[in-house]
Amino acid sequence: MGIFDKFKIGFKKSASAFTSGLRDIIIKKEIDDKTLDQIEEYLIQSDVGLVAAKEIKKIIAEEKIDPKKDIMNEVNLILKNYIITLMKPLENEGFFNKKEKLNAVLVSGVNGVGKTTTIGKIGKILKSNGSKVMFSACDTFRAAAIEQLESWANKIDVQITKSAQGSDPASVAYNAIEEALKGGFNHVLIDTAGRLQNKKNLMEEYKKIANVTKKIDPDAPHDVILVLDATSGQNVINQVEEFNKIIPITGLIMTKLDGTAKGGILLALAKKYKLPIIALGLGEKEDDLQIFNAEKFAEAFTQIN
């Protein structure tokens, strides 16, 4: 199955819902001021964000679409091109090909976004690219989290460093990086406990993990990935804002895009923060984490290829 097919199938529910709603506005209508306002309102309701919605509305207005043409198709083409222009600079396929030296990756996010599963899937992609990968189980609050990461490590045959439940997460991360440097590893993926962005003590602990890794390598963590749940809608904006204040984020991964989530939130994030998008979670299977590609995302989102 090709990458477009995987994006298309993964996005089927959210893309179908989006285009269906848009079609209801446009069908059998000319693009007049009232229709443009309805399109803008619909885009905002679809989590695209106010700024992007206004820009798209302006482009549609300036295009002066011939009413004899397939208006829905013309609007979708405008959307597709807008998405590609906005998001192409945010592709970061190179993340999966870093092998020159150890890349310590801090993976964070609020509770329930699928961090541990995402780490397992990242690990599988990295290993398939020839990288030597280690997992570091720094979510020491939940025994289940350690067990889940260990299960992934066994499944894809990568090394894991762990400690007993209740151990200091920062020390676990430190030991992992130290061991990885000695063992010639390319990547250490550091799993952290889910934490609400408004809980100061938990966010301080998260910062401590990053600071401790710097004792081994001043540039560590080399990547800081925030995992987001697409079903959270506009809440993810606040999550990016708060996590980015503590430790600058180098990349985003959006999960749960295979359901009825409004994929438009990715446009809002791209417009506001311009952070690289590492990958998208399009299902529960091992291979359902797809490296982000702006063109394939745009094609799947608008259902145009």
Indicate where each model-derived feature is located:
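N-terminal accessory targeting/assembly segments
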Residues: 1-19
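Residue-level signature of catalytic and energy-coupling elements of molecular machines
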Residues: 11, 47-49, 110, 139, ...
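Alpha-solenoid HEAT/Armadillo repeat architecture
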Residues: 12, 27, 44, 65, ...
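Primarily NTPase-proximal linker/entry elements flanking Walker-type ATP/GTP-binding cores
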Residues: 17-138, 145-166, 173-190
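Short hydrophobic/aromatic residue motifs in ordered secondary structure
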Residues: 50-52, 142, 258, 286
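Conserved catalytic-core segment of NTP-binding enzymes
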Residues: 148, 169-183, 198-303
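Short glycine-rich anion-binding loops that position phosphate/pyrophosphate groups of nucleotides
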Residues: 193-195
